[in-house]
């Protein structure tokens, strides 16, 4: 395993689909950490997050989409308005958000979080 930044970036850009999900993780709020027993989880559509960095710091909203190609997520309240007045979602890096409420409707995700096989 190389530690050269260029090779690390290349590995990130050329990562297979099953490995990209691990890179799309965000920290959990203190309440969720206590409940789940983990520090971070991969982000999913439907999770409620809070933005920690950038112009939209402090905004909360549900995750509307996860783009594994560009490693970005779109959040409900994080929008910009175009000159014609239409709203456009601003892509946010998952490292800049904190999961406030994880969507636990999926049995596979519950098993993944709890460690039950």
Swiss-Prot record:
Single GO MF descriptor: structural constituent of ribosome
Pfam families the record matches: KOW, Ribosomal_L26
SUPFAM superfamilies to which the protein is assigned, alphabetical: Translation proteins SH3-like domain
SMART domains tied to this protein: KOW
Region described as Disordered: spans on this chain: 1-28
Origin: domain of life: Archaea
Biased composition (Basic residues): 1-10
InterPro entries the UniProt entry points to: KOW, Rib_uL2_dom2, Ribosomal_uL24_CS, Ribosomal_uL24_euk/arc, Ribosomal_uL24_KOW, Translation_prot_SH3-like_sf
Protein's GO biological process: translation
Gene Ontology CC: large ribosomal subunit
Keyword field contains Coiled coil: no
UniProt KW keywords: Ribonucleoprotein, Ribosomal protein, RNA-binding, rRNA-binding
Family label: Belongs to the universal ribosomal protein uL24 family.
Subunit and partners: Part of the 50S ribosomal subunit.
Function description: One of two assembly initiator proteins, it binds directly to the 5'-end of the 23S rRNA, where it nucleates assembly of the 50S subunit.
Protein name as catalogued: Large ribosomal subunit protein uL24
């Amino acid at each position: 395993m190389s530690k050269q930044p260029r090779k690390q970036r290349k590995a990130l850009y050329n990562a297979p689909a099953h490995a990209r999900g691990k890179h799309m993780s965000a920290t959990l709020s203190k309440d969720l950490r206590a409940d789940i027993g983990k520090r971070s989880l991969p982000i999913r559509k439907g999770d409620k997050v809070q933005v920690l960095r950038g112009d939209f710091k402090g905004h909360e909203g549900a995750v509307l989409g996860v783009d594994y190609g560009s490693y970005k997520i779109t959040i409900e309240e994080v929008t910009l308005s175009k000159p014609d007045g239409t709203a456009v979602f601003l892509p946010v890096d998952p490292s800049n958000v904190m999961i406030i409420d994880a969507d636990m409707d999926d049995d596979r995700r519950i098993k993944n979080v709890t460690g039950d096989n």
